[in-house]
Amino acid sequence: MGNACRGSFGGKTFQGYPQPQDHSESNSNPKHNSDSPKPKKEQQPLVTMNRTSTNQSYYVLGHKTPNIRDLYTLGRKLGQGQFGTTYLCTELSSGIDYACKSIAKRKLISKEDVEDVRREIQIMHHLAGHKNIVSIKGAYEDPLYVHIVMELCGGGELFDRIIQRGHYTERKAADLTKIIVGVVEACHSLGVMHRDLKPENFLLVNKDDDFSLKAIDFGLSVFFKPGQIFTDVVGSPYYVAPEVLLKHYGPEADVWTAGVILYILLSGVPPFWAETQQGIFDAVLKGHIDFDSDPWPLLSESAKDLIRKMLCMRPSERLTAHEVLCHPWICENGVAPDRALDPAVLSRLKHFSAMNKLKKMALRVIAESLSEEEIAGLKEMFKAMDTDNSGAITFDELKAGLRKYGSTLKDIEIRELMDAADVDNSGTIDYGEFIAATIHLNKLDREEHLMAAFQYFDKDGSGYITVDELQQACADHNITDVFFEDIIREVDQDNDGRIDYGEFVAMMQKGNPCIGRRTMRNSLNFSMRDAPGAH
């Protein structure tokens, strides 16, 4: 089955679980014998909201969109969820197949429901570009539905693969866990908490490749600031962390959930289970992990050590996603990397600093044309770094932010990044400069963005960008100290002294021309875990 939308909007916030009573040993610590239940698909939400009919003429997305049927043909049903249905769809212009999740607006009763849909789309845009996260193609709205068009994953669910196999070898389980926790690390580094990780929410692109995994379904995901505490109880019973049940949690809950998935990968059964939902919650709150039943006596101590550290009852003592990836059981050849990878925004900033002025201005133009849902995540990150709420990031704020995210950059390197992003040489990075420097470069694959940017520079509509037009654009952006002829010469492939659309597109889409230099997109890819000024 393809990109099913089961549960995307199913596990809604509710009033919470009753505090646990005395737990019987039979409920909280059962042995995983031959009668132990296999993990079940979480088909039901933790609570069902009461819904009534309402007028659906409003815009859920907040703006008018093209008619999806002018761009795609909708085909057979791939999956069914509480709020909508996923269909196979084909792009008319290219013939490429995608998945389309159509969400019924009549089921979006409350303001919170509408915000959930918007936020899911925002988060998918924000996480765009990660190889193990399903990519969003676009969002559309008509009077009855919101349609989310995304990458098609036709290889089926990881859950079904687990059921077929029973359980995995340690090496294969380690490789799969590396992918799953890699997704968690990517989410956390961009200030996103998933909140509903489970095997059903990982699809295979290719049914013959166990490792072609893509995370789907960000319907319960939220943006978070470091230190922020969440109290709404969401998720799926088998996988929910104890602190979620106690209504006091943060992104550490995602690591717990990944630990539950790892336990299932190795044993074929969940670590916490009972005959009733409340019994499962009681078992989670007790936190006893069974390593005595088969196959655990035959598995390595290193695997058990990692599970204990991921299923640690105290969130503050639980491993972070990056620490999980550095654990000897996960690492290639049992050797952890000697340094942390650049967080997402940091790597984006590094890439940006290597671009010429024309490309930076073009990215600013593209950034200004992006929809609110495409940049909502970056807006949250900007606010977290702008600790004095001045509307601009100073050198000290950038330096403090990067230090908080574990960066070891020297002051001179941070200054280089600052200067690269500060296109107008004001001494600070304003909101527009930040967005331009940190938008994911997959935006450059979209023809409408490239054409709009080219037309911005081509003031007279001649089909060429001339030196005079480039000079005018720089003046409009308060950019000085630019050698216009040098920019033209760098981009002009046929040496006619001007830039045509093909040359412009080639410049925008080519890789970093200055390998080794720091770029702004690369440097603001920091982890939101310790965002400065966030509360």
Swiss-Prot record:
Gene3D superfamilies: EF-hand, Phosphorylase Kinase, domain 1, Transferase(Phosphotransferase) domain 1. InterPro entries: CDPK_Ser/Thr_kinases (IPR050205), EF-hand-dom_pair (IPR011992), EF_Hand_1_Ca_BS (IPR018247), EF_hand_dom (IPR002048), Kinase-like_dom_sf (IPR011009), Prot_kinase_dom (IPR000719), Protein_kinase_ATP_BS (IPR017441), Ser/Thr_kinase_AS (IPR008271). Residues 1-46 are annotated as: Disordered. One of its GO terms (cellular component) is cytoplasm. Pfam families: EF-hand_7, Pkinase. A lipid is attached at G2 (N-myristoyl glycine). A lipid is attached at C5 (S-palmitoyl cysteine). Residues 32-43 have a biased composition (Basic and acidic residues). Residues 336-366 are annotated as: Autoinhibitory domain. Activated by calcium. Autophosphorylation may play an important role in the regulation of the kinase activity. Residues 373-408, 409-444, 445-480, 484-514 form the EF-hand domain. It is a lipid-anchor. SMART domains: EFh, S_TKc. Ca(2+) 2 binds at D422, D424, S426, T428, E433. Residues 72-330 form the Protein kinase domain. Ca(2+) 1 binds at D386, D388, S390, E397. Ca(2+) 3 binds at D458, D460, S462, Y464, E469. Belongs to the protein kinase superfamily. Ser/Thr protein kinase family. CDPK subfamily. This is Calcium-dependent protein kinase 5. It comes from Solanum tuberosum (Potato).
